[in-house]
């Protein structure tokens, strides 16, 4: 699933082509996504100008002079800027035609994504209203995490992947951040010290910033708006490296299942706290 860096990379890629432009038409080829694409989306959007493009967690928001489009890439989705004459492929579900001859094309083979219209304040929509702070904001810091972790017996990895605690951190960047902070992923959140939270928040911010600069991480499905893969996969220290030697101590990378997800870690660099 695309995480914050991949969504931010996508937002940055489409922004120069869409902001300030007018939507001339919308073509919906398949409305059956996680939530149905509105059948009258063309009527809702035609003739409106895109005034801004922002990101909230893993969601992309297209602000129009009236209303908003809320987009989520799901497990396998991506957005491309294409010519309006470009032939659609099998999983190209929605085209947003712009008055500059280009189109925003939404592709989603597994159809877990979203492409919906919101009339009112989008930040009060149920999908956004309860999200935690952005990890690259000043609101996300060790004091905040320490306060939220009080009496939380869940694993620290599940804790930082909870979008109500902090948005945008999925399996890849949680594993990498915990490795750099030398924290075992199964450690109870309430046992993490202030010093460890200082280290963890710092590494989360640095990793996300580095991943954005690298265009995200492409392991299978993710491609940016210009069709290029993300290159942060070459910087991964533990994710996807089970049984390979740790790049720090040369012990074998192991995995443990936490909340149904395989979590990579180094047993030497990240000892469990009992």
From Swiss-Prot:
It catalyses: Hydrolysis of DNA containing ring-opened 7-methylguanine residues, releasing 2,6-diamino-4-hydroxy-5-(N-methyl)formamidopyrimidine; 2'-deoxyribonucleotide-(2'-deoxyribose 5'-phosphate)-2'-deoxyribonucleotide-DNA = a 3'-end 2'-deoxyribonucleotide-(2,3-dehydro-2,3-deoxyribose 5'-phosphate)-DNA + a 5'-end 5'-phospho-2'-deoxyribonucleoside-DNA + H(+). It comes from the Bacteria. Involved in base excision repair of DNA damaged by oxidation or by mutagenic agents. Acts as a DNA glycosylase that recognizes and removes damaged bases. Has a preference for oxidized purines, such as 7,8-dihydro-8-oxoguanine (8-oxoG). Has AP (apurinic/apyrimidinic) lyase activity and introduces nicks in the DNA strand. Cleaves the DNA backbone by beta-delta elimination to generate a single-strand break at the site of the removed base with both 3'- and 5'-phosphates. Gene3D superfamilies: 1.10.8.50, MutM-like, N-terminal (3.20.190.10). The keyword Zinc applies. GO terms for biological process: base-excision repair. This is Formamidopyrimidine-DNA glycosylase. A zinc finger (FPG-type) spans 237-271. The active site is at residues 2-3, 58, 261. Belongs to the FPG family. Keywords: DNA damage, DNA repair, DNA-binding, Glycosidase, Hydrolase, Lyase, Metal-binding, Multifunctional enzyme, Zinc, Zinc-finger. InterPro entries: DNA_glyclase/AP_lyase_DNA-bd, Formamido-pyr_DNA_Glyclase, FPG_cat, MutM-like_N-ter, Ribosomal_uS13-like_H2TH, Znf_DNA_glyclase/AP_lyase, Znf_FPG/IleRS. Pfam families: Fapy_DNA_glyco (PF01149), H2TH (PF06831), zf-FPG_IleRS (PF06827). Monomer. GO terms for molecular function: 8-oxo-7,8-dihydroguanine DNA N-glycosylase activity; class I DNA-(apurinic or apyrimidinic site) endonuclease activity; damaged DNA binding; zinc ion binding. Its cofactor is Zn(2+).
């Amino acid at each position: 699933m695309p995480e914050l860096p991949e969504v931010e990379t996508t937002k940055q890629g489409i922004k120069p082509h869409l902001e300030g432009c007018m939507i001339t038409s919308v073509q919906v080829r398949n409305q059956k996504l996680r939530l149905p694409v509105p059948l009258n989306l063309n009527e809702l959007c035609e003739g409106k100008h895109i005034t801004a493009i922002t990101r909230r967690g893993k969601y992309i928001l297209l602000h129009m002079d009236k209303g908003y489009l809320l987009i989520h890439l799901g497990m396998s989705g991506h957005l491309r800027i294409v010519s309006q004459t470009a032939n659609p492929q099998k999983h190209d579900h929605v085209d947003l035609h712009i008055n500059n001859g280009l189109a925003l094309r939404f592709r989603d083979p597994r159809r877990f994504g979203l492409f919906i219209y919101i009339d009112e304040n989008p930040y009060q929509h149920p999908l956004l209203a309860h999200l935690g702070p952005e990890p690259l904001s000043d609101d996300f810091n060790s004091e905040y995490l320490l306060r939220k972790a009080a009496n939380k017996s869940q694993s620290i990895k599940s804790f930082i992947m909870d979008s109500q605690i902090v948005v945008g951190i999925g399996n890849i960047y949680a594993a990498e951040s915990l490795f750099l902070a030398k924290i075992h992923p199964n450690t109870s959140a309430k046992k993490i010290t202030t010093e460890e939270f200082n280290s963890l928040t710092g590494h989360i911010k640095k990793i996300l910033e580095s991943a954005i600069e690298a265009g995200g991480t492409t392991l299978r499905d993710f491609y940016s708006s210009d069709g290029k893969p993300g290159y942060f996969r070459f910087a991964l220290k533990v994710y996807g490296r089970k049984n390979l030697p740790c790049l720090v101590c040369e012990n074998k990378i192991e995995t443990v299942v936490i909340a149904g997800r395989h979590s990579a870690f180094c047993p030497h660099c990240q000892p469990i706290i009992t």
